[in-house]
Amino acid sequence: PFPLPKEERAGLLMHPAWLIAWSGNFDNDPIRRGKWILEHLLAGTVPDIPITVDAVVPEDPHKTLRERLEPTEAKACWQCHQKMTPRGLPSENFDDFGRFRKREVLGENLSIFSDRHRDAKSVPVVTAGAILNSGDPTLDGEVMDAFELVHKLAGSTRVRQSFVRHAFRYWLGRNETFDDSPTLMAADRAYTENGGSMKALIAS
């Protein structure tokens, strides 16, 4: 267990359980974190990785994870990665165990016992990211850290409607159809009018 000061957390996207679930085995994974935000909060999709593409992030003990992700900015890759990676990078303030950090350790895999890499070389974490091509022009733009990302998402109508849609799919065990539009609209209205009440959403 480790402390969770309020000034270091805000919402689901900064909860250790979510951060761990969308990390790799040995490192953070901004791509997977950003893909989750795209699909679950912004109602977006990306195609499957082409079978001809080597999708492994290169290992280099002298580079940060952000630097090792630079190959995904190539034109052929960026058309999809722009929807994911910039949204996941703000969570670099947290390691793959969900712990808050200000520096990234280089040259070795992080240990759950932080004192084991106390003397290892480290660099300040860069948390800048962006929301690009979200489908909501009021949402698109640069974000400086996970807090700004979370607050922008929390105020988005698109995110709210996507949340309601995913709740519908979860509770009914199927995707929505065109005939479900009145139900979804009623659910969104009930959720909004009752201050984001899950009880009201379920009852609707």
What does each of the following model-derived ranges do?
Residues 1-158, 164-171, 180-199, 203-204:
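Active-site substrate-binding loop specific to GH73 endo-beta-N-acetylglucosaminidase modules
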